[in-house]
From Swiss-Prot:
EC category: transferase
Organism: Helicobacter pylori (strain HPAG1)
GO biological process assignments: NAD biosynthetic process
This protein's pathway: Cofactor biosynthesis; NAD(+) biosynthesis; deamido-NAD(+) from nicotinate D-ribonucleotide: step 1/1
Lineage per the UniProt record: Bacteria, Pseudomonadati, Campylobacterota, Epsilonproteobacteria, Campylobacterales
Pfam families: CTP_transf_like
Protein name: Probable nicotinate-nucleotide adenylyltransferase
MF GO annotations: ATP binding; nicotinate-nucleotide adenylyltransferase activity
EC number from the UniProt entry: 2.7.7.18
Gene behind the chain: nadD
Length: 174
């Protein structure tokens, strides 16, 4: 995992946000595939304090951050950021995008999202402005409906991960 200073030398950044509640192997597969698809990018993993579209998290924010820290240790080109956590509220994606654009001035900023999020992107805060500021990287899951989106995006194909954070929480009765 990199420090903030190492990001300053990067012209391309990618943001991968989420609740990571809990972190599982599909999250890590998405990180690996993003780094493979975009070989010159630094990837910033951005755990949410609270996802604006979901119920409050099952795991507390410190636990989720520590899980990510352990899992990402030693992965080159990845930075774990606590920007959204420090806000102590649900942070719209556009706010995080603007923050990192101002902080690092990347030539290109990619936003890594799931196909399920892409279907509802129009309901996000300032969605049109968001699409002007980022290049989308969209991960599809095997067995899920094909993406119907008229805009441009980079696909991450075949995330064969039947595990989801929601399914894990449901199996625990939460």
């Amino acid at each position: 995992m990199n420090t903030m200073n190492s990001v300053l030398q990067c012209k391309e950044l990618a943001l991968y946000g989420g609740s990571f509640d809990p972190l599982h192997k599909a999250h890590l597969a998405i990180i690996d595939q993003t780094l493979e698809l975009l070989p010159f990018v630094k990837l910033i993993v951005l755990p949410a304090y609270q996802n604006p579209f979901k119920k409050p998290c099952f795991l507390d924010v410190q636990t989720r951050f520590k899980e990510l820290e352990r899992a990402l240790r030693g992965i080159d080109r990845v930075l774990l950021s606590d920007f959204e956590i420090k806000q102590e509220r649900a942070v719209p994606t556009i706010e995080s995008v603007i923050y990192f654009q101002k902080l690092y001035c990347p030539k290109t900023l990619y936003l890594v999202i799931g196909a399920d999020c892409l279907r509802h992107l129009s309901s996000w805060t300032n969605a049109k402005e968001l699409l002007k500021r980022v290049e989308l990287v969209v991960f599809e899951r095997i067995g899920y409906e094909e993406i119907q989106f008229k805009g441009r995006y980079f696909p991450l194909k075949g995330i064969d991960a039947p595990i989801s954070s929601s399914a894990i929480r449901a199996s625990l009765g939460v």
